[in-house]
Amino acid sequence: AVCHWCHVMERESFEDQATADVMNTHFINIKVDREERPDIDHIFMNACQILTGAGGWPLHVFLTPERKPFSAGTYFPPKPGYGKPAWTQVLNYMHTIFKNERDKVEEQAERLAHHIVQVDQSFIHTMQIPETEPLFSEKELLQAVAGMQAQFDLEQGGFGQAPKFPGSMS
C-alpha cells in the first residue's frame, strides 16, 4: 500500500491479533491492489461514494456471497474517534446485520448494484465520442501495437525497465 492511511490502519488494526481474530472469524478478507485491478477499485469506490458521499483509501467494502457490495467505508480507527466508530465495532455490526437482517442486506445490495450501473452508464454516455472517420489506419494501429509489444517487460510487467511506479497526477 502506498497511501498513508493504509499503512496506519495496517499497523493499528490488521497487525493487532484481537482485531485479526474478529476479521478471520466472521469474514473472508480479500485485499485488492487498486493498481493491479483498477476495474474492481472503480466499482468499489463508486459503491463507497454512493453510500457515504466520500471515498478514499484504505477502502473497505462488505459484499454479499454473490459479490454485491452492501456497505463501504474508508479509514476506521482502532478506537472510536475522528467521528468514526472503531474498526472492530464496524466488523461486529456488519456481522450482526448480515446474520440477523439478511433480507435488508440483500435489498441494500440490489439497490446499490442498480445505482452503480446507472452511474456508470451515465458516465459512459457523457464520454461517448461521435462517430467520425478513424483517426488511424489499421496499418498504423498494428505498427503501434508492435512497438508497444517490443517495449513490454515480460518479467516485471509494464513498459520499460523496473522498478515501476504509478505516474504522478500533476
Q: Would you name each region that the model predicts?
A:
Residues 1-170:
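Replace the tail clause
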